[in-house]
Curated annotation (Swiss-Prot):
Catalytic activities: [[Fe-S] cluster scaffold protein carrying a second [4Fe-4S](2+) cluster] + N(6)-octanoyl-L-lysyl-[protein] + 2 oxidized [2Fe-2S]-[ferredoxin] + 2 S-adenosyl-L-methionine + 4 H(+) = [[Fe-S] cluster scaffold protein] + N(6)-[(R)-dihydrolipoyl]-L-lysyl-[protein] + 4 Fe(3+) + 2 hydrogen sulfide + 2 5'-deoxyadenosine + 2 L-methionine + 2 reduced [2Fe-2S]-[ferredoxin]
Species assigned in the record: Thermobifida fusca (strain YX)
Listed name of the protein: Lipoyl synthase
Record: residues binding [4Fe-4S] cluster 2: 81, 85, 88
Enzyme class: transferase
Pathway recorded for this protein: Protein modification; protein lipoylation via endogenous pathway; protein N(6)-(lipoyl)lysine from octanoyl-[acyl-carrier-protein]: step 2/2
GO molecular function, one term: metal ion binding
Gene: lipA
Length: 312
């Protein structure tokens, strides 16, 4: 294999990855579809109105639970990212021109779907002078404007930890500001060459200093050790991270990083307990957990924790 599906030549790392066949999933990696009344109603509405969510387009295994809670995730900034992470299925390339009407359309979709909580994520836009900071901030502002009772979780790139760009994003006051470190320092550069571990921690620290509830994610099965996971959790907590999700890496294609190991469910339980002992206000840990899984519930846990801390 020397040509990518979109017709370009493979990167050297993609060619190396492609020599490893797609791994067989263990029996505990299963999607259990439970279609409740809220999910059924929302699914019909999304289809009827022609709306687009990451939940459907990425085939998220948690769509049944999240939609039952009236929660959904939206991708902004286009479908081409200016950076390439070795686990991510979003294409890397030259993005289309900035669509300044997108924030309003997303907000209208949130209103049409009657969402209680919306997660907004997006691609890195290093081609723009502001890295897309206005787009992220304006999307939060429009959602709040059109949906006063809806919570918004904003999952952002690092904006190179530029204080002015981060301030622009933070000023939109999302209920939760998320930035995912995804993996441990030893393999970080290979997995996320466009990012830096310490810089990602700095983003979380700055968000916490701005008074926001903060969140991050760790993906397991890409070559890290158990000790490194524990240290990464401590690094996040010390950086000011309130909420943490821990998940299993599922390889999108042969061009992506091979799965190093399948983490057993009991290890996820142990890691969840360890994270709670470290002090995180809310933790979701499991093979099919994703960073936006039960996002509204985790946010409420963080608020309750802050209230309790204020009283003590």
């Amino acid at each position: 294999m020397s040509i990518a599906p979109e017709g370009r030549r493979l990167l050297r790392i993609e060619a190396r990855n492609s020599t490893t066949p797609i791994e067989k999933k263990p029996p505990w990696i299963k999607i259990r579809a439970k279609m409740g009344s809220e999910y059924t109603e929302l699914h019909a509405l999304v289809k009827r109105e022609g709306l687009h969510t990451v939940c459907q387009e990425a085939g998220c295994p948690n769509i049944y639970e999240c939609w039952e809670d009236r929660e959904a995730t939206f991708l902004i900034g286009g479908d081409q990212c200016t950076r390439r992470c070795d686990f991510c299925q979003i294409a890397t390339g030259k993005p289309a021109a900035l669509d300044r009407g997108e924030p309003l359309r997303v907000a209208e979709s949130v209103r049409t779907m009657g969402l209680k909580y919306a997660t907004v994520t997006g691609v890195a836009r290093d081609d723009l002078d502001d890295g897309g900071a206005w787009l992220y901030a304006e999307t939060v502002r429009k959602i709040h404007e059109l949906n006063p009772g809806t919570g918004v979780e904003l999952l952002i790139p690092d904006f190179n930890a530029d204080p002015d760009l981060l301030a622009e994003v933070f000023s939109s006051r999302p209920e939760v500001l998320a930035h995912n470190i995804e993996t441990v320092p030893r393999i970080f550069k290979r997995i996320r060459p466009g990012f830096r571990y310490e810089r990602s921690l700095e983003v979380i620290t700055r968000a916490r200093e701005a008074g926001l509830v903060t969140k991050s994610n760790l993906i397991l099965g890409m070559g890290e050790t158990r000790e490194e996971i524990s240290q990464a959790m401590r690094d996040l907590y010390e950086a000011g991270c309130d909420l943490l999700t821990i998940t299993q890496y599922l390889r999108p294609s042969r061009l992506h990083h091979p799965v190093d190991r399948w983490v057993k469910p009991e290890e996820f339980v142990e890691l969840g307990r360890e994270a709670e002992e470290i002090g995180f206000a809310g933790v979701m840990s499991g093979p099919l957990v994703r960073s936006s899984y039960r996002a509204g519930r985790l946010y409420r846990q963080a608020i309750e924790r802050r209230k309790a801390d204020a009283k003590s």
